[in-house]
Swiss-Prot record:
Pfam families: Arg_tRNA_synt_N, DALR_1, tRNA-synt_1d. Its EC number is 6.1.1.19. InterPro entries: Arg-tRNA-ligase, Arg-tRNA-synth_N, Arg-tRNA-synth_N_sf, ArgRS_core, DALR_anticod-bd, Rossmann-like_a/b/a_fold, tRNAsynth_Ia_anticodon-bd. Keywords: Aminoacyl-tRNA synthetase, ATP-binding, Cytoplasm, Ligase, Nucleotide-binding, Protein biosynthesis. GO terms for cellular component: cytoplasm. One of its GO terms (biological process) is arginyl-tRNA aminoacylation. A motif ('HIGH' region) lies at residues 123-133. This is Arginine--tRNA ligase. It is an enzyme of class 6 (ligase). Belongs to the class-I aminoacyl-tRNA synthetase family.
């Protein structure tokens, strides 16, 4: 609704001789007696106007010039809010817009010509995907979907962590299990990867090579074999959740020198050094964040010669700027909270515009059954495996449950609830609303000859009851919900919104006879139902869940 009110409020401000660059807020009052929408613009610009907010609100109301049939009443409330009451026909026109635009309802071209990159999942290829990584994957996928509705050219990227100490430990783990297959007695280190999948990779190598690799200390063949198997497994798991990536960035490329040029990591060190932010002591190389007011410097290259996570992360982001992205969204787990501010500080020092970098941190996931914490793992080590969760509750429930709480909140994933075929299950509740409308349309086609193809919403202005207006009002919010979800990188807002739409539709369905109504009213209510179905479908597409036509 901001798009509707904004030009009229700006026009009133101009008539009043008030210039401001402050963002005009349009909100929905919790209590409908305060109108359908309200704005606090009088508070925001009272100082510039040299008037108290209530007096200014009254002046602005006199200057607002809305088209006939849209706003029925405008009033000053409290210390200076401006409340707007809309005509029922205005809400119904929004439902007509849904039918006219179809899949395009809620979309715009605000991001046209802009390139965005969303990096998500980026799990180390050291084992099967865990549930925690799955939450980040769904979050990132939904954010990418939201960006596409706004016209951005979106690249979905997986930062492939194929370098560093953990990959060496993976290779050593496979080698130890391989040597066991060769008949050697091995004391397997507790610090290494314990899952059954390590033994399975070793078994494959033994079948292919016999004991021919037993005498070598070279880890490359073990690393490459493990990496190929595990990464293939990761991609298959993600595909089950309809999570895809357009590009895979190999971390090892940040360590490589090219055509006589230093590696990307080394270029970061050199550039920070030139700015006076590199220190060398205790055998390590440090990012001197004490110069930025921090208590301690942060290590970039350890005394072992291995880089910390910060160095390749900084170098990786430099490549994003070099690739010309206008917006860079990074989806991380909570373990990155402490590290990432240092990456942004380094980028600022290097002269990059960090306002283009957005961070979405998602908290941990705990699976519960009957209120008790459980491990979703059948055999592959002590881990909560994403595949096992999908096997148990399905892809739709997995996706929706991951994002039905805010990303900043720890998620208790109730496995029993996710499997319920009742309105208590949020997934069932949403999908049932869609299936109910599909069933209604089929019945209308059969019983009264309703033709969905000719439904353009011409009869919608007939509708004026409270359930009908409330339902149409909810549809009107869809474009704003997309914008809000994107600004906050929070798909949970879309989940909550769709629940409201479904809830209002179920109420409308119960209180407003449809097939038994007279012809014109029946057609109008069927058209409103079609508009609801379209909004649900558009929302489901953003969330990546299916829209069943029967349940």
């Amino acid at each position: 609704m901001r798009a509707f009110f904004l030009p009229f409020i700006q026009d009133a401000l101009q008539k009043a001789g008030i210039e401001t660059d402050k963002e005009i807020q349009i909100d929905k009052p919790n209590d409908k007696k305060f109108g359908d929408f309200s704005t606090n613009i009088a508070f925001l610009v009272a100082k510039e106007a040299r008037k108290n907010p209530r007096e200014l609100a009254g002046q602005l109301i006199g200057l607002l010039d809305f088209p006939e049939g849209t706003v029925t009443k405008t009033e000053v409330a409290g210390p200076g809010f401006i409340n707007f009451h809309l005509a029922p026909a205005f809400f119904m026109r929004s439902a007509q817009e849904v039918l006219a635009k179809g899949e395009g309802f809620g979309c715009n071209e605000s991001g046209k010509g802009l390139k965005a990159i969303v990096e998500y999942v980026s799990a180390n290829p050291t084992g099967p995907l865990t549930i925690g990584r799955g939450r980040g994957g769904v979050l990132g996928d939904c954010i990418a979907n939201l960006l596409e509705t706004q016209g951005y050219e979106v690249t979905r990227e997986y930062y492939f962590n194929d370098a560093g100490r953990q990959m060496q430990i993976l290779a050593e783990s496979v080698r130890y299990r391989y040597l066991e297959k060769c008949g050697q007695v091995i004391e397997f280190p507790e610090t290494h990867y314990q899952g059954d999948y390590i033994g399975e990779i070793a078994e494959t190598l033994f079948i292919e090579h016999g004991d021919g690799l037993a005498a070598t200390d070279e880890l490359t063949i073990f690393k490459e074999a493990a990496e190929a198997v595990i990464f293939s497994s990761i991609r298959k798991t993600l595909e089950r959740l309809l999570i895809t990536h357009d590009s895979f960035f190999n971390e090892h490329t940040l360590y490589q020198s090219r055509e006589g040029q230093p590696s990307a990591n080394q270029r970061v060190i050199d550039a920070l050094d030139a700015k006076g932010f590199i220190g060398n002591y205790d055998g390590a190389t440090w990012f001197m964040t004490t110069k930025l007011g921090q208590e301690k410097d942060k290590v970039l290259i350890k005394s072992s010669g291995d880089p910390s996570y910060r160095l390749p992360d900084i170098a990786y982001h430099v490549t994003k700027f070099e690739r010309g992205f206008d917006l860079m969204v990074n989806v991380f787990g909570a373990d990155h909270i402490d590290e990432y501010p240092d990456v942004l500080e380094a980028l600022k020092i290097l002269g990059y515009d960090t306002s283009k970098v957005k961070i979405a941190i998602n908290q941990f996931v705990t699976t519960t059954v009957g209120g008790q914490t459980v491990k979703m793992s059948t055999r592959k080590g002590n881990a909560d495996l994403l595949d096992d969760l999908i096997d148990d509750v399905g892809a739709d429930a997995t996706r929706l449950f991951f994002i039905m709480r805010g990303k900043d909140s720890h998620l208790n994933f109730d496995v029993e609830l996710a499997k319920k075929q009742s309105k208590d299950n949020p997934v069932f509740y949403l999908q049932y609303a869609h299936a109910r409308i599909c069933s209604l349309v089929r019945m209308a086609e059969k019983e009264v000859g309703f033709d969905e193809a000719t439904a353009i919403g011409a009869g919608l202005p007939l509708l004026s009851s409270e359930p009908e207006i409330d339902l149409a009002s909810a549809l009107l919010d869809f474009p704003d919900i997309i914008q809000s979800s994107l600004r906050q990188l929070e798909p949970q807002k879309m989940v909550e919104y769709l629940h409201t739409v479904a809830e209002r539709y179920h109420k409308f369905y119960q209180e407003c006879p449809i097939l038994k109504a007279d012809e014109h009213l029946r057609t109008a209510r069927l058209e409103l139902s079609l508009a609801v179905r379209q909004v649900l479908r558009n929302g489901f597409k953003i969330l990546g869940i299916s829209a069943p036509e029967s349940m």
